[in-house]
Amino acid sequence: GKVLAKVHKSPISRIRTRQADIRNIEALRAQGYKKGSEKKYVGNFSLIHRTTDPQTVYVKSKIDRDDIIDIQDFDVVQYLYGIDRMNLNEELATAIVLGDGREDGDEGKIAQDKIRPIWLDDELYTIHADVDIAGMKTSLQGTNTGANFGDNYVYAEAVIQSLLYAREKYKGSGTPDFYCTPHLLNVMLLARDLNGRRIYDNVNELRAALNVGEIITAEQFEGKVRTTKDQKKKKLLGLMYNMADYSLGSTKGGEITHFTDFDIDFNQQKSLLETRCSGANTRVMSAIALEEDVTDTGVGG
């Protein structure tokens, strides 16, 4: 629910973004002028643009009229509508953040070029940062081989360090939020120092350490693994992003609409809930995906 509430709603179903690429800023610097000399042109810069077209996403269901009549405890039709609406909202939110997870050839797949998932987006838009847990353990222990830092503490420190270092490249707007699994949040909250004292007494202290506006847990993050172009497997740990930078576009008629019909041949009440929209991150380098390299562990296939 928070994802759909936080994204930017656009009244245009086709999302177009165009931005200047000035990463070669040194070549664009202003120059001092010496009397009598020729003034030189500064370097050129390129424009980054992409267009995202809409796709229809729907939930279709049916119920026998006999069941509607027999169930008297509650309004079963309204109850099923509530479930359909919840499923549609969850599917849209999952497609926006992670992708819908279906295989490319699946007939029901939400195309990743129609609703672009933040996690799987191009490196220009999403910074994919590795969390080096083994390296953090070595760094914390140092030359004191007798020191025994708890796994939770090492894990928490590795996540925080990777996130803060990656944030040096962050170009998003406002204060971002951190999305992760409930387990990762618990691991970081349970981190203890060598004396057994909790590092973070509550979520607010952890939120301050991560320098984010809110920590939002989502079970859908559990077990998500992607394969990179060089065939490495990366397990998603968390995602830092300000959903206001993501545009969800839909024109009049494309908003979430509910249709009902009664089939007299089969004596069934039928329901269709659908929307036609597009979605895309509109700011470059505005998302940070924290990942763990699981290439050699066999995770994810």
Please provide the spans of the model-predicted regions.
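Solvent-exposed loop and beta-edge segments used for protein-protein assembly and interaction
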Residues: 53-55, 172, 265
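Short, basic/hydrophobic alpha-helical segments
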Residues: 161-172
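Short, flexible coil/linker elements and helix-boundary hinge sites characteristic
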Residues: 32, 121-124, 130, 171, ...
